[in-house]
Amino acid sequence: MYLIYYYTIIAVATASIANEKIFYDIDSASVYYENFIKQHNKEYTTPDQRDAAFVNFKRNLADMNAMNNVSNQAVYGINKFSDIDKITFVNEHAGLVSNLINSTDSNFDPYRLCEYVTVAGPSARTPESFDWRKLNKVTKVKEQGVCGSCWAFAAIGNIESQYAIMHDSLIDLSEQQLLDCDRVDQGCDGGLMHLAFQEIIRIGGVEHEIDYPYQGIEYACRLAPSKLAVRLSHCYQYDLRDERKLLELLYKNGPIAVAIDCVDIIDYRSGIATVCNDNGLNHAVLLVGYGIENDTPYWIFKNSWGSNWGENGYFRARRNINACGMLNEFAASAVLL
């Protein structure tokens, strides 16, 4: 039965390598859909909304079959997003705006505060694998919800890790503060990580998450200067011409905010994604580590779609293929005071 098989796949979702192949019988889509609704406690306002979601679900099943057919090291399957069409998903659950250059401040220079760095030079010695999580330098996986705020989560995730490296202590900082107080990025309509860093410098710092909790919708700025927990001195945009330099930078300086095309990972369940195309950057994630499994080198990314997506909120993608277009935009990192 599907239900038994579905829970079996969930059980292996965090295995070190995804050897299981999933194939969904499209003719049984309605059975899968009913189980999906129960598993994820889905509610639809009207019968028409339910029917439209089923159309999306059925189309996504075909996408999962196609990805599983061409992927021998990753599993793609039903998850909590499977009733959303891909275009809507990117609009509601991603949020990178690569052409964002305007500002409410007419004197704003988008490169004024973040130093532009082309990383070159001879290769440095690095270990075969490295994971900042194992050093307790990465905070918990968070969930952006129906809000194009990935840019804020990637930026704050970078700052949290930089703080942990500097102070040997994990703290959770406020993404909501960026949604409300950042005058350059566009809140739930998207933004860029380096602009977020620059706005934090302008604002004066960032508060603890507990003092300025995430709402997933924009409100008036209610910043309390006395509660600022972390301040930044400056920030970097890295122009990385090859993945070896990115690996060295990650190992030397800590987790890095990067831009990707997320379309091919929406249905990701586990394993190493060896197919992740770049049809336009639309999402921001935090690069936290790298490794090798069964002779396949991979990156480890922290996402902001909750811990019940992917490998406990993370995904892995093959190295040295510019997976998901990860080298097509500047990587970014903050420097703390």
Swiss-Prot record:
Role, per record: Cysteine protease that plays an essential role in host liquefaction to facilitate horizontal transmission of the virus. May participate in the degradation of foreign protein expressed by the baculovirus system.
GO molecular function: cysteine-type peptidase activity
Family the UniProt entry places it in: Belongs to the peptidase C1 family.
InterPro entries from the UniProt entry: Papain-like_cys_pep_sf, Pept_cys_AS, Pept_his_AS, Peptidase_C1A, Peptidase_C1A_C, Peptidase_C1A_papain-like, Prot_inhib_I29
Cysteines engaged in disulfide bonds, as pairs: C147-C188, C181-C221, C276-C324
Prodomain residues: 19-126
Signal peptide residue numbers: 1-18
Catalytic activity: Endopeptidase of broad specificity, hydrolyzing substrates of both cathepsin L and cathepsin B
Residues annotated as the enzyme's active site: C150, H283, N303
Name listed for the protein in its UniProt record: Viral cathepsin
Keyword Protease: yes
GO BP: proteolysis
Keyword NAD among record annotations: no
PANTHER family: CYSTEINE PROTEASE FAMILY C1-RELATED (PTHR12411)
Database matches in Gene3D superfamilies: Cysteine proteinases
Species this chain originates from: Spodoptera litura multicapsid nucleopolyhedrovirus (SpltMNPV)
Mod. after translation: Synthesized as an inactive proenzyme and activated by proteolytic removal of the inhibitory propeptide.
EC number in record: 3.4.22.50
Keyword terms: Disulfide bond, Hydrolase, Protease, Signal, Thiol protease, Zymogen
